[in-house]
Amino acid sequence: MRRVVFNQKGGVGKSSIACNLAAVSAAQGYRTLLIDLDAQANSSHYLSGLTGDALPTGMADYFKQVLTGGAAGKKARPPIHETPFENLHLITATAELADLQPKLEAKHKINKLRKLLDNLAEDYERIYLDTPPALNFFTVSALIAADRCLIPFDCDSFSRQALYSLLDEIEELQEDHNEGLTVEGIVVNQFQPRAALPLQMVNELLAEGLPVLPVHLMSSVRMRESHQVCMPLIHFDPRHKLTQQFVELHGYLES
């Protein structure tokens, strides 16, 4: 299973959702890998506790090998790092990814990530791909490489406006590059059940026939606190309601 967590809008919780679902997967015994493709490296920091120059090499190292071409490029494999959490491994992002993007685009390396995931298939049962908040080279590579796509969504008008174009972009990519990509659904994040607007917006999306998932992720300060200590919720506060929502969401997606 290769799941990409994607939304071209920033601030909707892509990294939090990718990392926490990956952590639940690993806690349930699946050999799990998270690949961070965002130069901001939020997922890398969350799962390793490291930032900036302290982050070990990862996807940037891999793509530099790819750009060399020849035998070295064909055998390229990124450094894979253990995390403090059993069964959960990480390929980090660093700021260097942003500098590599135009070179990778110029050399048409858009399918290299899919080949890498093919080579990792025997090592990992579950692979999660965290993407940048833009439809750029790394995001398209992830959508081509994945077989499932999860779309985080905040209940506000800006997110809703962006959602329609996002779904159109995914459909076009499916037709052109990856017919095997399945949109699993829209996961509502930062949900406030007592507020009228979020529930109204969810109902309107459902009425339009959009695939809104039945498990919503509540807004909670515990998420920000888990970021602060670099510990996914399943390890930081396993009994918290938001943690249990992640467990429920993971179970729904696995069913």
Question: Can you describe what each PLM-predicted range is?
Answer:
Residues M1-S255:
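P-loop NTP-binding core
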